[in-house]
Amino acid sequence: MEDEMQIDKKEVEIEQKPPRFEIKKWNAVALWQWDIVVDNCAICRNHIMDLCIECQANTDSAAAQECTVAWGTCNHAFHFHCISRWLNTRNVCPLDNREWEFQRYGH
């Protein structure tokens, strides 16, 4: 039976073709974003990564350097300055009307 199943063990030479192209230099680029569905502040309508309207108007002030994002326990995100002004009048989330509680804020 072994005689019937002999395998030809000749080495096959594979012809090496030159590569179609060669990468000589590669500049990697990365992109990231906040893990939230809505990327605009619902109060000022600016992109959450941009300055809020208050900081855009006062670019000379130190507050513009501290324009951060604030998340509530409901997972809605707003500019810290925007939600702070909102909370002076009503202590609820502007989007779902639940009582506002800070989950985290900062970059």
Swiss-Prot record:
Metabolic or biological pathway: Protein modification; protein ubiquitination
Physiological role: Component of E3 ubiquitin ligase SCF complexes, which mediate the ubiquitination and subsequent proteasomal degradation of target proteins. Seems to recruit the E2 ubiquitination enzyme, like UBC3/CDC34, to the complex and brings it into close proximity to the substrate. Component of the rik1-associated E3 ubiquitin ligase complex that shows ubiquitin ligase activity and is required for histone H3K9 methylation.
Record has Ligase as a keyword: no
SUPFAM superfamilies with a match to the protein in the record: RING/U-box (SSF57850)
Residues in RING-type zinc fingers: 52-97
GO molecular function, a single term: histone H3K14 ubiquitin ligase activity
Positions of Zn(2+) 2 binding: 74, 76, 93, 96
One matching Pfam family: zf-rbx1
Keywords on record: Chromatin regulator, Cytoplasm, Metal-binding, Nucleus, Transcription, Transcription regulation, Ubl conjugation pathway, Zinc, Zinc-finger
Residues reported in the UniProt entry to bind Zn(2+) 1: 41, 44, 79, 82
Stored PANTHER family: RING BOX
Any one Gene Ontology BP term: heterochromatin formation
Binding-site residues, Zn(2+) 3: 52, 55, 67, 81
Protein name: RING-box protein pip1
Cell compartments where the protein resides: Cytoplasm; Nucleus
InterPro entries, sorted: RING-box_E3_Ubiquitin_Ligase, Znf_RING, Znf_RING/FYVE/PHD, Znf_RING_H2
Free-text comment about domains: The RING-type zinc finger domain is essential for ubiquitin ligase activity. It coordinates an additional third zinc ion.
Gene3D superfamilies recorded: Zinc/RING finger domain, C3HC4 (zinc finger) (3.30.40.10)
UniProt organism field: Schizosaccharomyces pombe (strain 972 / ATCC 24843) (Fission yeast)
GO cellular component, one term: cullin-RING ubiquitin ligase complex
Keyword Zinc-finger carried by entry: yes
